[in-house]
Amino acid sequence: MDGLETALPSLTDNASLAYSEQCGQETPLENMLFACFYLLDFILAFVGNALALWLFIWDHKSGTPANVFLMHLAVADLSCVLVLPTRLVYHFSGNHWPFGEIPCRLTGFLFYLNMYASIYFLTCISADRFLAIVHPVKSLKLRRPLYAHLACAFLWIVVAVAMAPLLVSPQTVQTNHTVVCLQLYREKASHHALASLAVAFTFPFITTVTCYLLIIRSLRQGPRIEKHLKNKAVRMIAMVLAIFLICFVPYHIHRSVYVLHYRGGGTSCSAQRALALGNRITSCLTSLNGALDPVMYFFVAEKFRHALCNLLCSKRLTGPPPSFEGKTNESSLSARSEL
């Protein structure tokens, strides 16, 4: 993960950074566009995840592993959203970081902590769906809310420890009378980052894709599974994979290219500018995850959609709310954990 690749910048690094900053400097138009994007993203993600977290806590009696993972995902998204205003100020200030060293470290720490926590919670949701649909009987003892909470606590600790170097190493550099926070698009480019990327992203991404491929195979071979459960599973697969492909895959692919070529001796100024712009755009896409997850909750989770409609419409919907416990046929044993 990016925290593992952070090191103390040397004088040579600062000289290289100054040159790179001149090549990769944002234009006034780019600053305006990025600021508008982060403002809209902040509003949508904050409202969506705050509402989602409130609904998940309010509906805690459901007591399912899926709800536990979704609740922690909402916490991660909400925490990540809270650092977006610093990026707003950065772009409105013309690429200047006015907050100092400690806030820069905290911004980078919280951004990467919650981004990778979100990735792993999405992977946990995929694994839970796999167990519920493919092994509904065998997984009943394993899929308990307590175990889900323990898994989430373990993931929070592991990711926090991996990101901890961001809190203890200098992250600001002054170039041309402008203070630069290295955690805003200028992360240290190190070849050690490639191994970090493989551990932090490749493993959960492959796990998620594998789980959903096995789910699809099980759905195609399981004619007794009710049609609406099949449709719900397909929607879940499509939404989670879309979030991965839109928010995380572009960033990590570009990050690999960025690590290999940015600030390299043979990299031209125009190439550095293209890499820097790509880094900013893909970083924007990662923050979009906070706005897309509530959309996933709405289209995939019936109880979330029902509660949200009740809240917004101020009236009860006709018909009974979706039940996690109301299925009786063999194929619906996984209904206890339905979203």
From Swiss-Prot:
Keyword Nucleotide-binding in record: no
Membrane topology, record value: Multi-pass membrane protein
Cellular component annotations (GO), alphabetically ordered: plasma membrane
Transmembrane regions listed in the UniProt entry: 37-57, 65-85, 106-126, 148-168, 196-216, 233-253, 281-301
Main location: membrane
Single annotated GO MF: G protein-coupled receptor activity
Tissue expression notes: Expressed in brain, kidney, and heart. Highest level in brain.
Gene: Gpr17
Subcellular location: Cell membrane
Cysteines joined through disulfide linkages: C104-C181
One of the GO biological process terms: oligodendrocyte differentiation
Note: Administration of an antisense oligonucleotide specific for GPR17 significantly reduced brain damage following ischemia.
PANTHER family: G-PROTEIN COUPLED RECEPTOR (PTHR24232), URACIL NUCLEOTIDE_CYSTEINYL LEUKOTRIENE RECEPTOR (PTHR24232:SF44)
Full protein name: Uracil nucleotide/cysteinyl leukotriene receptor
Task of the protein: Dual specificity receptor for uracil nucleotides and cysteinyl leukotrienes (CysLTs). Signals through G(i) and inhibition of adenylyl cyclase. May mediate brain damage by nucleotides and CysLTs following ischemia.
Inducing stimuli: In brain areas affected by ischemia.
Family designation: Belongs to the G-protein coupled receptor 1 family.
Cytoplasmic side: 58-64, 127-147, 217-232, 302-339
InterPro entries reported in the protein's UniProt record: GPCR_Rhodpsn (IPR000276), GPCR_Rhodpsn_7TM (IPR017452)
Species per Swiss-Prot/TrEMBL record: Rattus norvegicus
Glycosylation sites: N14, N176
PROSITE patterns in the record: G_PROTEIN_RECEP_F1_1, G_PROTEIN_RECEP_F1_2
Lineage: Eukaryota, Metazoa, Chordata, Craniata, Vertebrata
S-adenosyl-L-methionine found in the keyword field: no
Topological domain spans for side Extracellular: 1-36, 86-105, 169-195, 254-280
Protein keywords: Cell membrane, Disulfide bond, G-protein coupled receptor, Glycoprotein, Membrane, Receptor, Transducer, Transmembrane, Transmembrane helix
